[in-house]
Amino acid sequence: MHIDALSRRLIDRYQHGMPLCAEPYRAMAEELGCSEGEVLACLEQLQEDGGLSRIGPVFEHSRAGASTLVALAVPEARLEQVAARINAFPEVNHNYLREHRYNLWFVLTGPDRAHIDALLAEIEADTGLVPLDLPMLHAFRIDLGFPLGDPS
């Protein structure tokens, strides 16, 4: 995937937050020295190319409810079926296949710990697999950004 100069500047500047105003794309364009149409076209292209999955807020989950990292040891023959079932839960995000006995890893979120516990029990009942529940005890550093900078 080719990332042009405008895309790099756009990602570097706004991956940690967008302008909170009535016309955020226009404000972004003004700051970047281009048109609103160029910003929108750039974002569309990034999404089409698979370089951008979504535009939206990221919430501090510990203030809004509960979450946990979950791992399942899924037999290879059942991976697609189990992954599809896990993905059907709206509370699931970041579902990844890993090379390990515990090979399916995902994050569960909910309004409180009781909800998480109920989801874990439902996942176990639905799949016959015992979830490994790994709640975060302390965040040392969380930065979901990846600075691209100038490639030259």
From Swiss-Prot:
Q: Which UniProt keywords apply?
A: Lyase
- What is reported when this gene is inactivated? Insertional mutagenesis results in the loss of respiratory nitrite reductase activity in vivo and in vitro. Mutant strains synthesize a periplasmic cytochrome cd1 that lacks heme d1.
Recorded E.C. number(s)?
4.1.1.111
The GO molecular function terms of this record are: lyase activity
In which pathway does this enzyme or protein participate? Answer: Porphyrin-containing compound metabolism
Give the InterPro entries listed for this entry.
AsnC_trans_reg2 (IPR040523), HTH-Siroheme_Decarb (IPR050684), NirdL-like_HTH (IPR053953)
Q: Name one Pfam family in it.
A: AsnC_trans_reg2
Q: Which reaction does it catalyse?
A: siroheme + 2 H(+) = 12,18-didecarboxysiroheme + 2 CO2
* Quaternary organization: Probably forms a complex composed of NirD, NirL, NirG and NirH. All proteins are required for the total conversion of siroheme to didecarboxysiroheme.
What family, per the record? Answer: Belongs to the Ahb/Nir family.
Q: What does this protein do?
A: Involved in heme d1 biosynthesis. Catalyzes the decarboxylation of siroheme into didecarboxysiroheme.
Q: What is this protein called?
A: Siroheme decarboxylase NirD subunit
